[in-house]
Amino acid sequence: MNYSFLVLLLFISVVLFILFYINKEAVILYSNTGLGKFIAIILILSYATFHIGMGIVALIILLSYYKVYGYESWNILNTIDFLDGIDVIYYINLERSKERKTIIEEMFKDNIFYGKPIQRIDAIDGKDPTEQVYDKLVINTKRNSKLEYACLLSHLTTIRTFAESTLYENALILEDDMTIELKKFWRKSLRTVMENAPADWEIIQLCYITGGLLKSDYTLNNYQRNRYGGIASMGAYIINKTAARKLMTEMYDPVTNKFSLRDYHTHEADHYLFKVLRTYTYKYPYFIYPTDNTSTLHPEHLNSHIRSKSRIEYMYYQLSY
């Protein structure tokens, strides 16, 4: 019997055991690779072959991981299609934001996006003096800046594009500064996220900025002010076809090509859409802003983005589900 091989296997098990109970983040990073799980299975087979006791130890370690992180985390060769349930992806990008376009298109080369229809939506530029933002709206009282209305218009245009499509039922809408930095924490497909959501959902928010962590997996977000200041961000969200068409029936006039806004809602994109559509914020965001993100709309919000991101990352590191 090759005892040096057994010693090596035992050493690897001890390291994994320590990582599991001391540093869950390391285990998450390790186990999120198909190679990691493949090695784990090889360890079990090797132990079972050379020493039944060691095989049992390895099996206990892996079953402990399964108990903590759940069935869907047991993705041996990364076979979970995390974007399952999403029929189309739209990303909103200003014509002048060339660098952002390059970065997000590079992100789309990741395997998780393979086979998904992806469409760029030309954002309305509120800083362009020739852009007649207000001519595209029917409003009685201007409540916000031209930049805010341009942002809202960009999202409404995207939703209208989706509503008019005939092939898709669920769309993922992204702003062009989204990242998949949180991918290493993903455990469920978006189909599962949608199936587990309250039955009346119209939007599911997959990126958020808030002053505190959420308690429930799904939090109704009608943008009521709370002690944390609300749950903001239109960075990433799922919208279903029924909701998109309902919204366009209410707001969009194809004859005049204008959107009518209710006067009793704040005319900021997240405030407005979360008020008029049944929106739930998913506690475990899939997308997040880069740490050095400078918003084209609110560059002064950088510090709040950083603080919120830190809280979310801490939540994931402490996560046991």
Give the ranges of each region predicted by the language model:
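An acidic/histidine-cluster motif and surrounding catalytic segment
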Residues: 76-174, 178-321
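Acidic, glycine/proline-rich intrinsically disordered low-complexity segments
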Residues: 1-4, 70-78
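Alpha-helical transmembrane segments and their membrane-interface exit regions
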Residues: 17-18, 61-70
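A cytosolic-side transmembrane-helix exit/cap motif
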Residues: 29-32, 52-61, 74-76
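Generic transmembrane alpha-helix motif of multi-pass integral membrane proteins
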Residues: 38-49, 57-62
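Short, amphipathic, aromatic/basic-enriched membrane-interface segments that mark the entry/exit
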Residues: 20-32
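Short hydrophobic alpha-helical membrane-embedded segments
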Residues: 5-12, 29-39
